[in-house]
């Protein structure tokens, strides 16, 4: 029992206590309601959207958000359209892409921080940034993946991808049921659109994104190619 929902999967955080937040609680509610099934939930391309006006950051509101999401999961399940699927209707297509690293990242500076052994190197994400640059220099590519199941397509995208990528994917194949899972390979961190890097904001700022505005052209092309494969 798969479900997909695009939003930042957070209500309140930085408590030092691990928890699945409201999407995990909603998934557990569905497990209780349908014990014979295993609910598996994916967060969609929710890099630049959140619970918005429905979330005031209060601990009490986490349950309310979980109940709303669980209700959406229930209604989606009850309105499932079933179709027979043969082995030939199942596909797994991979499109490796080289996402452009952000220009503000300097490998020499990050290497120097590593050599000095500063505690903040790992705590502030510099270790992840250095690993990303090393991967890029080595020619490592990120796999963009599409699972085909009959008339359904499920895309798996890297990082905290902006919702525009999900909307573009659905618009590219209105004849199919298209679902999107984000938060895959997290090396890029936030993945914005080209214009978003011009507009500013936290998500596309140097502390938050490891890729540049050219990422939109690369990722959109991969999405279109994957969705056009097959019937």
PLM regions: where:
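Non-catalytic substrate/cofactor recognition surfaces at enzyme active-site rims
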Residues: 1-231
């Amino acid at each position: 029992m798969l479900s997909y929902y695009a939003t930042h999967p957070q209500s309140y955080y930085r408590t030092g206590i691990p928890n699945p937040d409201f999407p995990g609680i909603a998934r557990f509610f569905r497990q209780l309601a349908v014990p014979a099934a295993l609910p598996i939930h994916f967060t969609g391309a929710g890099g630049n959207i959140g619970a918005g006006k429905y979330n005031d950051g209060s601990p009490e509101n986490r349950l309310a958000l979980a109940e709303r999401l669980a209700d959406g999961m229930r209604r989606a399940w009850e309105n499932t359209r079933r179709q027979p699927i043969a082995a030939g209707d199942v596909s797994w297509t991979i499109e490796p892409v080289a996402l452009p690293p952000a220009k503000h990242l300097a490998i020499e500076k990050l290497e120097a921080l590593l050599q000095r052994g500063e505690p903040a190197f790992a705590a502030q994400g510099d270790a992840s940034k250095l690993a990303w640059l090393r991967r890029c220099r080595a020619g490592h590519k990120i796999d963009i993946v599409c699972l085909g199941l009959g008339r359904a397509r499920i895309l798996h995208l890297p990082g905290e991808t902006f919702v525009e990528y999900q909307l573009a994917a659905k618009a590219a194949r209105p004849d199919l049921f298209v679902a999107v899972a984000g938060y895959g390979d997290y090396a890029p961190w936030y993945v914005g659109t080209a214009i978003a890097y011009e507009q500013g904001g936290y998500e596309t700022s140097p502390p938050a994104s490891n890729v540049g505005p050219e990422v939109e052209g690369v990722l959109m092309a991969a999405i279109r190619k994957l969705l056009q494969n097959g019937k």
